[in-house]
């Protein structure tokens, strides 16, 4: 064993660059898988900690003018563990720039926050005339501790001012850059003064037993009704669901696909290198076999280096993967307001890294090593050199007919076929890298195209809501504004169909602002209390068809309708757990909810739909209806927020493609270096007869370009299949997507593949150019 170890270490020392490339390939493969596993575990732990935390409210009830002291009455319920009231207000804030949205919570005692407790990460809690902001608010506009910001209800109201005393992290609150909204905290008295209403408007309850939440909710509502306090229906927390869980799961699943691709490429790299080592040392293997060495004794001679590289690559890959996974988990956790648990290295990550590293190292090496030991000693001891097959093969005959090409280019094109298996493996590595690029670009394009299509379904420029329920006929008042060319009162709420949560929408039958794409049947008619339309994804999920009866349940009320049509609309929002939509008239939706003929919000279209035109029109609308404290969401802003969220997916997938491409580059460089090692004598002869360094660089670059071009051909086929798979996978996790693949992506992939292949070939070309002829010719 001492001799074997000595030989192995000597081989590593002699072939430093090859060994480094081999090690790098395994490190990248292991690191990718470990990073994904580490990220998934930490995010899952952070979500469990946040949503099982003693700080999280189990029950939220919107109230109006909740008096101080009534918490003690609610606290008497045996299932109420803690109860707090707060006041919140949607405002706009500015630090010298454009006004942006902010949700301000008013807290009575910052030293004794028991429910939904934010973490102070800089500065101090605010006093009178002060406020703190979530740290991610700095991504919306520059703001620092000590700055004085302006706050206003709308453009029609005079601003108030607050000094920033610190920054917080809000549990479970998505990043401000995703929501396009900041989150802040201020003394409750200040927020009540800004609202010009006494009392609180939020009731937060922590329960002893979550399974009794509905019973406790009804008991609290009886208390509120008895005292004449207006309130909403209440929301019970689902500890199994967190904002962004579905989206994060889809992202990690897609990234896992690319990490597996990286592992496969690492295996190709090890296989290629071990095959080259066996071809180089055929004579040594023959000598060992001739003096009586068994196949196992010879085999372990070549498996030990693979074992060492596998162990070292695994350990280094685990370290890199944990570091990368920590950065990735921190980034993703910050986007949805999750604080990561303290650093821990789970045994499964160590085991996973070792299994992959050793599996790739030994598993990929054992086949070429075993194949090499199958040859008899006599065949191994024969001269293993160049065969007289010039012009014999099809490719050689084809190249011989080329005219107008340099000798070096022709030689480079011919040389890649001297080691066919090695070249094919290298083409596969390059092809997988090209396929990964095509797949991600197709996924990005499909997501963007689908989002564009979904937003095109809505012809509204903005959505308006007010501080009180408004009758659907309020559209007549809105029509008096000369900027508004169309307005409709819409209803939206949660409902259940066959125990499946869905979105209930009330939209006028003659709507002009919802461009329904009916795929089967028709749109519902006005004044028909029994007709509904469902989305295609809800129909697929529940097996619904046109003409089927449909029972819709809203809390304790339910109504059976007839499905008259199916529309293609899979638009959703961050954190949504609903499947599809059910459309009916606003009258029918309000009847189901047991409410008056009211609208939850109004869809409006302006004469000028440009962002500047929409902003100007909204300012005038807010001024005109300032008594109702209008809140507006511009459609272009909502679309921009969605695109910002999708951009995160694109950036992270592109990062994984870079990792895959890096392995492909390493594989190409490794192949060319192996070729140089085997052809030192030829290269020395070329130098001795006058070939310059530039000619040898051109020779290697031409080989790399040919390998890249052929790999690109493989990548075209594999890329289309991978693109289809990724789009289908993402569609199953998020929303159904329209497959989009531009010919320009295929052209760009080809150009990038050739450029990268040529660039990766320069370094081996320089090594070839630096060979001294006398040393190269002496090489045995």
Give the residues covered by each predicted segment.
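Interfacial "coupling" helices/loops that link adjacent transmembrane helices in transporter permeases
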Residues: 15, 268-310, 667-705
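Membrane transport/envelope proteins' first extracytoplasmic loop
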Residues: 1-264, 276, 295-296, 454-458, ...
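Short coil/turn motifs that cap or connect alpha-helices
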Residues: 144, 294-295, 376, 545, ...
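Juxtamembrane segments of multi-pass membrane proteins
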Residues: 59-64, 405-528, 533-537, 545-548, ...
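N-terminal Sec/SRP start-transfer signal
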Residues: 1-30, 303, 391-432, 701, ...
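Short cytosolic juxtamembrane segments of multi-pass membrane proteins
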Residues: 2, 374-392, 769-780
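C-terminal transmembrane helical bundles of large multi-pass transporters
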Residues: 489, 599-605, 617-620, 624-723, ...
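Small-residue-rich transmembrane alpha-helices
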Residues: 267, 271-274, 308-339, 348-374, ...
């Amino acid at each position: 064993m001492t001799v074997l170890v000595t030989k192995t270490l000597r081989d590593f020392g002699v072939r430093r660059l090859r060994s480094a490339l081999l090690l790098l390939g395994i490190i990248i493969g292991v690191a990718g898988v470990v990073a994904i596993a580490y990220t998934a575990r930490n995010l899952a732990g952070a979500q469990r900690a946040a949503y099982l935390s003693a700080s999280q409210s189990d029950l939220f009830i919107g109230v109006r003018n909740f008096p101080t002291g009534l918490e003690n009455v609610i606290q008497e319920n045996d299932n109420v563990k803690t109860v707090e009231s707060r006041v919140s207000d949607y405002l706009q804030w500015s630090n010298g720039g454009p006004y942006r949205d902010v949700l301000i919570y008013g807290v009575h005692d910052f030293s004794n926050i028991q429910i939904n407790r934010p973490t102070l990460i800089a500065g101090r809690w605010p006093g009178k005339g002060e406020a703190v902001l979530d740290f991610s608010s700095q991504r919306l506009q520059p703001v620092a501790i000590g700055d004085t910001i302006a706050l206003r209800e709308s453009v029609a109201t005079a601003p108030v001012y607050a000094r920033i005393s610190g920054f917080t992290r809000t549990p479970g609150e998505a990043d401000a850059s995703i929501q396009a909204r900041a989150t802040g905290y201020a003394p409750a008295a200040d927020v009540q003064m800004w609202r010009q209403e006494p009392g609180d408007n939020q009731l937060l309850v922590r329960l002893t037993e979550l399974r009794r939440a509905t019973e406790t909710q009804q008991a609290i509502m009886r208390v509120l009704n008895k005292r004449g306090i207006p309130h909403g229906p209440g929301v019970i927390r689902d500890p199994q669901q967190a904002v962004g869980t579905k989206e994060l799961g889809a992202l990690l699943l897609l990234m896992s696909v690319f990490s597996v691709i990286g592992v496969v490429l690492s295996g190709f790299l090890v296989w290629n290198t071990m095959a080259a080592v066996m071809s180089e040392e055929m004579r040594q293997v023959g000598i060992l076999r001739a003096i009586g060495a068994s196949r196992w004794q010879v085999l372990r001679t070549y498996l030990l280096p693979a074992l060492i590289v596998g162990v070292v690559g695994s350990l280094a890959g685990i370290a890199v993967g944990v570091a990368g996974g920590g950065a990735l988990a921190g980034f993703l956790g910050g986007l949805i307001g999750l604080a990561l648990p303290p650093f821990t290295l789970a045994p499964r990550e160590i085991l996973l890294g070792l299994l992959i590293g050793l599996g790739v190292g030994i598993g990929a090496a054992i086949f070429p090593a075993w194949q090499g030991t199958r040859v008899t000693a006599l065949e191994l001891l024969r001269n293993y050199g160049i065969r007289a097959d010039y012009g014999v093969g099809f490719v050689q005959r084809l190249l011989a007919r080329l005219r107008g090409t340099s000798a070096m280019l022709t030689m480079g094109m011919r040389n890649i076929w001297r080691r066919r298996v090695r070249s094919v493996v290298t083409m596969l590595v390059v092809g997988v890298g090209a396929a990964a690029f095509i797949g991600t670009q197709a996924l990005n394009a499909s997501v963007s195209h689908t989002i564009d299509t979904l937003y095109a379904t809505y012809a509204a420029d903005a959505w308006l809501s007010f501080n009180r329920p408004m009758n659907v006929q309020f559209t007549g008042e809105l029509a008096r504004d000369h900027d508004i060319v169309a307005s409709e009162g819409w209803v939206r709420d949660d409902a259940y169909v066959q125990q499946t949560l869905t979105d209930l929408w009330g939209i006028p039958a003659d709507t002009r602002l919802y461009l329904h794409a009916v795929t089967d049947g028709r749109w519902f008619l006005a004044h028909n209390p029994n007709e509904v339309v469902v989305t295609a994804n809800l129909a697929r999920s529940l097996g619904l068809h046109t003409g089927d009866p449909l029972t819709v349940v809203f809390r304790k009320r339910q109504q059976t309708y007839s499905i008259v049509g199916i529309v293609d609309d899979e638009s959703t929002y961050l954190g949504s757990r609903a499947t599809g939509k059910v459309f009916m008239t606003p009258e029918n939706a309000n009847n189901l909810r047991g409410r008056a003929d009211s609208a939850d919000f109004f869809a409006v279209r302006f004469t000028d739909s440009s962002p500047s035109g929409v902003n100007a029109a909204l300012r005038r609308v807010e001024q005109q209806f300032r008594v109702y404290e209008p809140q507006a969401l511009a459609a272009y802003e909502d679309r921009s927020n969605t695109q910002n969220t999708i951009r995160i997916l694109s950036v992270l997938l592109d990062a994984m493609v870079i990792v895959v491409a890096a392995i492909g580059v390493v594989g190409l460089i490794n192949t060319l270096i192996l070729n140089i090692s085997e052809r030192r004598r030829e290269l020395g002869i070329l130098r001795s007869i006058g070939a310059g360094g530039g000619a040898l660089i051109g020779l290697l670059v031409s080989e790399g370009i040919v390998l890249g071009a052929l790999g690109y051909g493989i990548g075209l086929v594999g890329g289309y299949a991978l693109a289809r798979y990724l789009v289908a996978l993402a569609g199953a996790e998020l929303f159904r997507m329209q497959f989009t693949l531009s010919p320009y992506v295929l052209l760009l992939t080809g150009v990038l593949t050739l450029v990268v292949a040529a660039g990766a070939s320069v370094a081996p070309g320089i090594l070839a150019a630096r060979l001294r002829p006398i040393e190269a010719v002496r090489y045995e």
